[in-house]
Amino acid sequence: MTKYTLDEVNDMYVDVLKEIGNVGSGNAATAIANMVGTRIDMKVPNVKLMDVGKLGSAIGPEEETVIGIFLEVSHDIDGSMMFLLDLESGHYLADKLLMKENVVHEQMEVFDEMELSALKEVGNIITASYLSALASMTNLTILPSVPYICVDMAAAILSVPAIEFGLVGDRALLIETEICADVAIRGYFILMPEQESYYKILSAL
């Protein structure tokens, strides 16, 4: 296919990219609400394709410690995807899922095994919801791996696909996600397809 610039691609596919974000967030909100037993609203203020090298500046300070839930994707497309969440939001969601009340977290970077497991499940639901929406829009079969979770600097987490798995691409789909419950939570879904898969996605949209 013709290799358009990112600005041209975002202009051409703005509606379908937003639809992927809206459908995915709606499915994720329903699933998470059922888990925590309270109403959850999710909004997608921003969806765009961008250079992988600019992801760090798009999501905030690269030296900031965040929670990252990471999965590989395969079959019709190859690449990786992740969901990033700030520490305060992570503790809030973990407390909700584990039914903890009035907990004071003195060490924000510390999560126990149960908390990490709960957050991994949240990340799995959100990434699976967006992935399902993308698969429906493109008629591509996209299979996720088992997720894993880590707490580290944003720059370190964003480098995982290339360092750990040799997955290399220069484009990413970034979906900014706002989760509205008792407090507002902002997270980022990122799909980083390999170069051939990137063009396959665009051809299928």
Regions found by a protein language model. Give the residues of each.
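Composition-driven recognition of glycine/serine/threonine/acidic- and proline-rich low-complexity segments
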Residues: 2-27, 31-205
